[in-house]
């Protein structure tokens, strides 16, 4: 991340398996989850599907907008997903350096 005023967040969205996919999609449409994504003050870094789990999303977030990301998830994702968030960072450059050091 080029700017120290930003943090990376990894968001885990686990599908609510008590609901059908149609029910989940209807809820997300009603709340505007996809329409309004990503939350204000954040930029999408990656979004992958973890099969039988849900989504793993990485966001670069302005440090003073972390609360707004949390509120976004509470207002738009709850009811369709269980939600967890973790501060994170890109380990790939470190792993590449370690690979060279351990060669």
Q: Can you name each region flagged by the protein language model?
A:
Residues 1-54, 61-67, 71, 89-103:
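Short S/T/G/P-rich N-terminal loop/turn motif that feeds into the first structured element of a domain
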Residues 73-75:
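Short, solvent-exposed amphipathic alpha-helical segments in soluble enzyme
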Residues 77-90:
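Conserved short beta-strand edge segments in small beta-sheet-based binding/regulatory domains
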């Amino acid at each position: 991340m080029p700017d120290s005023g930003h943090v990376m967040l990894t968001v885990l969205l686990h599908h609510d398996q008590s609901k059908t996919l149609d029910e989940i999609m209807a809820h997300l449409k009603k709340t505007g989850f996809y329409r309004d994504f990503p939350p204000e003050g954040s930029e999408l870094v990656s979004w992958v599907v973890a099969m039988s789990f849900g989504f793993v999303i990485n966001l670069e977030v302005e440090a003073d907008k972390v609360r707004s990301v949390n509120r976004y998830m509470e207002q738009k994702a709850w009811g369709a997903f269980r939600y967890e968030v973790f501060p994170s960072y890109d380990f790939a450059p470190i792993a590449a350096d370690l690979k060279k050091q351990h060669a």
